[in-house]
Curated annotation (Swiss-Prot):
InterPro entries linked to this entry: MetalPrtase_cat_dom_sf_prd (IPR023091), YbeY (IPR002036), YbeY_CS (IPR020549)
Name of this protein: Endoribonuclease YbeY
Similarity section: Belongs to the endoribonuclease YbeY family.
Matches recorded under SUPFAM superfamilies: Metalloproteases ('zincins'), catalytic domain
Any GO BP: rRNA processing
Keyword Zinc: yes
Pfam families: YbeY
Organism annotation: Lactococcus lactis subsp. cremoris (strain MG1363)
EC main group: hydrolase
Cofactor note (record): Binds 1 zinc ion.
Length: 162
């Protein structure tokens, strides 16, 4: 999987940037995503996170990670309008699945609050957002149990334990 990383803050260590690419590629293999899959991750500060949270979620505060899933729109492609394209073909035509915005301020706060490393927190946020982009959620206890178990399984197998 190709991951484009942008550090808007200029404060994220290169080790965290590399770890983020690696843990997302690891998670993509776990979900059997195609190698051609693409996504982006942007590291932001709390001010930008607040702005994005308000814009996309109508929530007036910063948050740790914002996940924006991208689904290709059939109207973007030229073909007979009576023709329906299979999901697999749409994915091949546009392999971009979404983007994450991770707040470096929230990552530091939460690592301290939970008593684990900053590396673990960045990994947790990246995998959490990645799973949201891939259809996982935690609105119900059942969904939460499934998502968090998979998230922990990925992080532990990768080596980011508590």
């Amino acid at each position: 999987m190709y991951v484009e990383l942008v550090d808007e803050t200029g404060q994220v260590p290169s080790e965290i940037i590399e770890q983020t690419k690696e843990v997302l590629a690891f998670a993509a293999k776990k979900l059997d995503l195609k190698e051609s899959t693409e996504m982006s991750v942007t590291f932001v500060d709390n001010a930008r996170s607040h702005e994005l949270n308000l814009q996309y979620r109508e929530t007036d505060r910063p948050t740790d990670v914002i996940s924006l899933e991208y689904k290709p729109d059939e109207s973007e492609f030229f073909f007979d309008e009576d023709m329906e394209l299979p999901e697999e073909l749409l994915e091949e035509m546009d392999p971009f699945i979404g983007e994450l915005f991770i707040s470096i301020d929230k990552a530091a706060e939460q690592a301290a609050d939970y008593g684990h490393s900053i590396e673990r927190e960045y990994g947790w946020l990246a995998v959490h957002g990645f799973l949201h982009i891939n259809g996982y959620d935690h609105y119900t206890p059942e969904e939460e149990s499934e998502m968090f178990a998979l998230q922990e399984e990925i992080l532990t197998a990768y080596g980011l334990t508590r």
